[in-house]
Each structure stands twice: as structure tokens, then as C-alpha cells.
């Protein structure tokens, strides 16, 4: 069973190192298979708001968007995403951001149009599919308006993926470990 440490911290004060916590849980009979960290390979991805979407002048499947990030800064992003619309809040990897696989975002042109970053989906953010709603698994990850965030915030903090993920082995003698609460 996968358990984000953040979920546990919502109910219990855990003021020790993550690995020490995992070792203590194993000593109680709740075997920890592994400890992984959400977002450890992602850096520089932030929240933006889509202001405009236009058709790319030289490509049928590409769109040219204008987005707002922190401090009213406007960026132009070229994308092939089909699930976005004006007013959506989405994760954007700006120039200099690093995605899993040591993929660095650079300024570039797509079919002659400048792109100053890349929109991200759940896969680029390395969110385990078990934690992603079905309608958010494909395409760009659209943030819910009820989430509390500001433009420019680190998307790992907004989505709670800047945390440890603990995988427990559910042994036959511990059926009580089949749920968190």
C-alpha cells in the first residue's frame, strides 16, 4: 500500500526523519518495502494561468498560448495539448526547469514560433497513477480552482508531491494496515 507521509502528518505529529520513521514502522510489524520521494527529479515547475490560445500559423496540431506566471510576467508556450482552455491553471516548466531523466527545459522554436517552456502532465510530474484522478491522467494536468495556490508557486507544493511516499507490505497478520484511518 502506498502512503504519502503528508497524509499521515495531517493526523499525527511526526517530528523525526523519514527513514527513521520507516524503520520504526517496520519494527512494529508494518513492513516498509521502500521509501521514495515525490518530485525529487522535478525542479522549476510552477503554476501558471492560460490567458490566450491561438492556432499555430504553420502547424495544424500545435497551439500558441500566452500564460501568466508570478508577478504578472507573460510567457509564450507552444503546445500540442488538446485538453486546455483559457482560464485554466496548469503546471509549466519554465526555461531552466529540470524534469525526470535530467531533461532540462530550454528556450526553443517549434516550427518557427518561440516557446518559453513546456506544460506538464501527471507523467512529467512523476505522480503515481494511483494518485491521479482518471480525467487527469491524459494530457496536461489541470489544477482545480478550489486548491489554494498562487501564480508562480512550486507545483510540487500545490499538489503535495514534495514529500515522501512510503510503500508498506501488507502481511497476512496485519489486516489493520489495509487502510490509513
Residue ranges and their predicted role:
Residues 1-181:
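Phosphate-backbone binding interfaces of nucleic-acid-interacting proteins
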Amino acid at each position: 500500500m502506498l502512503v504519502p507521509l503528508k497524509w499521515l502528518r495531517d493526523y499525527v505529529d511526526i517530528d523525526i526523519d523519514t527513514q527513521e520513521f520507516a524503520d520504526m514502522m517496520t519494527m512494529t510489524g508494518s513492513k516498509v518495502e521502500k521509501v521514495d520521494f515525490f518530485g525529487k527529479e522535478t525542479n522549476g515547475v510552477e503554476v501558471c494561468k492560460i490567458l490566450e490560445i491561438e492556432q499555430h500559423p504553420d502547424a495544424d496540431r500545435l497551439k500558441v498560448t500566452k500564460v501568466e506566471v508570478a508577478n504578472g510576467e507573460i510567457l509564450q508556450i507552444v503546445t500540442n495539448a488538446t485538453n486546455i482552455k483559457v482560464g485554466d491553471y496548469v503546471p509549466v516548466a519554465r526555461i531552466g526547469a529540470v524534469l525526470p531523466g535530467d531533461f532540462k527545459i530550454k528556450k526553443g522554436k517549434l516550427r518557427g514560433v518561440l516557446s518559453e517552456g513546456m506544460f506538464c502532465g501527471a507523467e512529467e510530474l512523476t505522480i503515481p497513477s494511483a494518485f491521479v484522478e482518471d480525467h487527469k491522467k491524459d494530457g496536461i494536468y489541470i489544477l482545480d480552482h478550489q486548491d489554494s495556490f498562487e501564480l508562480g508557486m512550486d507545483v510540487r507544493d500545490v499538489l503535495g508531491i514534495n514529500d515522501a511516499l512510503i510503500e508498506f507490505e501488507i502481511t497476512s497478520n496485519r489486516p489493520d494496515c489495509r487502510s490509513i484511518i
